[in-house]
Amino acid sequence: MSSIVRNSDDDPLVIAIQQPRIAIESVSPVVEEGAYPAKTESDRDLRLAARIFADGHEVLGAEVVWRRVGETAERRLPLLPEGNDFWSAQLRTPPCGRLYFRIEAWIDRFAGYRRELRAKHGARLPLDLELREGDELLQRCAERGGPEIAAACAPLAERLQACQSVEERVALWLAAQTGELLRLVGPREHLVRSREYPVEVERPLARFASWYELFPRSESGDPTRHGTFDDVIRRLPQIAAMGFDVLYFPPIHPIGRTHRKGRNNSLRAEAGDPGSPYAIGSEEGGHEAIHPELGDREDFRRLLVAVREHGMELALDFAIQCSPDHPWLREHPGWFAWRPDGSLRYAENPPKKYEDIVNVDFYAEQALPSLWEALRDVVLGWVEQGVTLFRVDNPHTKPLPFWEWLIAEVRGRHPQVIFLSEAFTRPAMMARLGKVGFSQSYTYFTWRNDKQELAEYFAELNQPPWRDCYRPNFFVNTPDINPWFLQRSGRPGFLIRAALATMGSGLWGMYSGFELCEAAALPGKEEYLDSEKYQLRPRDYQAPGNIVAEIARLNRIRRENPALQTHLGFQAYNAWNDRILYFGKRTADLANFVLVAVCLDPHEAQEAHFELPLWEFGLPDDASLQGEDLMNGHRWVWHGKVQWMRIEPWHLPFGIWRVRRVDA
């Protein structure tokens, strides 16, 4: 027989022999195979999982190996089998920053040996040969593992030799302490490693927060006087009493005068019209400056302190757009795309036009890299002032590589900074913004109104890829969006949307005036009449018909129920009425389980039979659950799976019930 010389570089047999015997699949949480980090928050249990299997009946061992960015020291967690080849571990997440993990798996000879020994011992089979095999396995481990392994194995070998009976030796081999020792020192045959996957750890505020937006210039209480930061400070107790965590301002910078907009977006401003705060920049300064009528740096610092004293944080608007008066046009004309006649094209976001705004050109020859660095420095400058939350205006109209770079630059130095994406655009772009680093995002929730589309949207956000890269912030309105539903639904409609937002996601927001049920619209448009973007709008926040108390109660319910502090865990349940959305949110251990029923009809009472999710507690259909109405504190016991409800929207268009086992 002639011998064949094989080239190991391209021989299929050699390549096959070198392939891993163990398969690692379906690793989670993973975004695009590790191209982008999955999202999580500090000080929580993060489930790391994978499907791991091999041929035959070999017993496998597996671990998660993880490290923090910038560290070389690795930490290990054992993965435990869940069934159907899935393995998982719970990692208590570290403080903010990037971490990396991989999965390692191997054939665990000692675990296989102990399993076989236990089975044969239980069947009362002769074990002399098996015990000799165990001794040889331990000896090989000591000989091949080096001095430290040999030293660790020696006490076990001595104890086995000292055993006086087969039963004693079997008991020692099967002892839990022996199993733990062998897990640590045993050979890891056919060891295979997954690639390394990134996870971005952010503050809990990135997942759970209630945002309140106001224009500080309207807080004077006088339609003829521009508001100040001190006026906002006087308002803080009211906002904090409603349970908000974040106070968010539109841009607070100087406003241009060229092409300044008048009331209701008029192309002509009258004397005294303040203009749109999004037309940033004048002779008083640009993105780094404060509008002089709001106050100065010292006033701003005093505001930041007051906001924190009321248990909130301040978020600023980062809008990359300039008025024609912005200092950058004089200082850096090469950052802009000039037309042949020497003019600049005004900004557009169809169908909207912004004649008072011009845009920078990110890829202009003179803008690379100085414009990018200047914008980064704007953000870092406000971080140095104490701002760690930024709502970013229309990020989908700026380059994705810019955002990925800027967010990494900022969070690399200040990992506590949170970025909210205000992008109402195509789903792929919204998801991609989350992947490149935005902590959270505005959503399509604003336009989801009927039962099917709400249930489908909430469920979609719980599934990949959204689940791991996108945190939805359910804003019920914005200065730009006066939703059709609110324009024609009256006070009950505002309560409906508040309930859906607060119960549907850990993140929700509202623009001031929502608590007063403001809905006057420009005819035929989803915009506010007398928009605050173009004029001062002082309000009576205690006006009759307000929903301040209900908002405060909803926010309190969120704080008291961990299941409601995330958009994850949504599960729709049966309620046999197309105008009632009925769903549940729960923690993994069922310690907190909240049911929510929302009447989607703001005008008519609705009734429905509905199912108590007894099966979620492992209970039969005739079992009972304790119920507690979280809006009024009433308690009772429900008996049986099918129940009945009636919701009258003029009283309260929703019900929120915490349920638990009767024997809990």
From Swiss-Prot:
Its EC number is 2.4.99.16. HAMAP family: GlgE. The active site is at residues 393, 422. It comes from the Bacteria. Belongs to the glycosyl hydrolase 13 family. GlgE subfamily. GO terms for molecular function: alpha-amylase activity; hexosyltransferase activity. Alpha-maltose 1-phosphate binds at residues 261, 321, 356, 394, 533-534. It comes from Pseudomonas aeruginosa (strain ATCC 15692 / DSM 22644 / CIP 104116 / JCM 14847 / LMG 12228 / 1C / PRS 101 / PAO1). It catalyses: alpha-maltose 1-phosphate + [(1->4)-alpha-D-glucosyl](n) = [(1->4)-alpha-D-glucosyl](n+2) + phosphate. Keywords: Carbohydrate metabolism, Glycosyltransferase, Transferase. The gene is glgE. GO terms for biological process: alpha-glucan biosynthetic process; oligosaccharide catabolic process. Coiled coil: none annotated. Homodimer. Maltosyltransferase that uses maltose 1-phosphate (M1P) as the sugar donor to elongate linear or branched alpha-(1->4)-glucans. Is involved in a branched alpha-glucan biosynthetic pathway from trehalose, together with TreS, Mak and GlgB. The record marks 480 as: Transition state stabilizer. This is Alpha-1,4-glucan:maltose-1-phosphate maltosyltransferase.
